[in-house]
Amino acid sequence: MSTWGQINLMDPASPIQMEMMLFHDHAMAILIGIFTLVSLLGVKLCFNTLSTRTMHEAQLLETLWTILPAFLLVWLALPSLRLLYLLDEQGSEGIILKAIGHQWYWSYEMPSMNISNFDSYMIPEEDLKPGDYRLLEVDNRPMVPYGLDINVITTSADVIHAWALPSMGVKMDAVPGRLNSMGFHANLPGIYYGQCSEICGANHSFMPITVEAIDVKDFIKMCN
């Protein structure tokens, strides 16, 4: 999860989030190169006292500043399209976890595993135990097996919410009367935190999302 003074993305816990981090680094490298080039040209322009009034065209220069930006855009677009395709395909055939947004808590069910609907409320600050995280702990968190695909289906019982789990690379709207679907694949066991990412009313900040990834054998025992 995020820590104090963090300047980068959260540590990835799923393949798709790892791909997102690589794409972020790829895009940042291009942006830093553009920034450096423009800065050097700006400094050169500021300190250059020479000028020419006889040159009316420079076809080579015009060709370069047309082709180079087009090349950079293609270099940025190709991995972006690949990542977009992976996001759409991830977890579509996995175990179904249904998340229903309410003001201001989440309820979950796993129909394919015979886990009926249960509510997940934030634990008040005065009830936290040592080591718990403020505004992130819940009284009843969904369990999922790590190493298997999970297909999250979201909807809402009232207003628009957003179910987000940053370390898994998941964020999607929960809209009343509509089912949205997105998948993730937990690489490691652990507890993963998120929050509602759509302003949904007075207690929007008190609507955490906590998912625990456990071993497949333990998950089967829990379901039985």
Curated annotation (Swiss-Prot):
Binds a dinuclear copper A center per subunit. Keywords: Copper, Electron transport, Magnesium, Membrane, Metal-binding, Mitochondrion, Mitochondrion inner membrane, Respiratory chain, Translocase, Transmembrane, Transmembrane helix, Transport. Residues 1-26, 83-224 are mitochondrial intermembrane. One of its GO terms (molecular function) is copper ion binding. It catalyses: 4 Fe(II)-[cytochrome c] + O2 + 8 H(+)(in) = 4 Fe(III)-[cytochrome c] + 2 H2O + 4 H(+)(out). It is an enzyme of class 7 (translocase). Component of the cytochrome c oxidase, the last enzyme in the mitochondrial electron transport chain which drives oxidative phosphorylation. The respiratory chain contains 3 multisubunit complexes succinate dehydrogenase (complex II, CII), ubiquinol-cytochrome c oxidoreductase (cytochrome b-c1 complex, complex III, CIII) and cytochrome c oxidase (complex IV, CIV), that cooperate to transfer electrons derived from NADH and succinate to molecular oxygen, creating an electrochemical gradient over the inner membrane that drives transmembrane transport and the ATP synthase. Its EC number is 7.1.1.9. Belongs to the cytochrome c oxidase subunit 2 family. Pfam families: COX2, COX2_TM. GO terms for biological process: ATP synthesis coupled electron transport. Cu cation A2 binds at C196, E198, C200, H204. The gene is COII. Its cofactor is Cu cation. Its main location: mitochondrion. The chain crosses the membrane at residues 27-48, 63-82. This is Cytochrome c oxidase subunit 2. Residues 49-62 are mitochondrial matrix. Mg(2+) binds at E198. One of its GO terms (cellular component) is mitochondrial inner membrane. It is a multi-pass membrane protein. The lineage of its organism: Eukaryota, Metazoa, Spiralia, Lophotrochozoa, Mollusca. It is found in: Mitochondrion inner membrane. Component of the cytochrome c oxidase (complex IV, CIV), a multisubunit enzyme composed of a catalytic core of 3 subunits and several supernumerary subunits. The complex exists as a monomer or a dimer and forms supercomplexes (SCs) in the inner mitochondrial membrane with ubiquinol-cytochrome c oxidoreductase (cytochrome b-c1 complex, complex III, CIII). Gene3D superfamilies: 1.10.287.90, Cupredoxins - blue copper proteins. Cu cation A1 binds at H161, C196, C200, M207. InterPro entries: CcO_II, CcO_II-like_C, CcO_II_C, Copper_CuA, Cupredoxin, Cyt_c_oxidase_su2_TM_dom, Cyt_c_oxidase_su2_TM_sf.
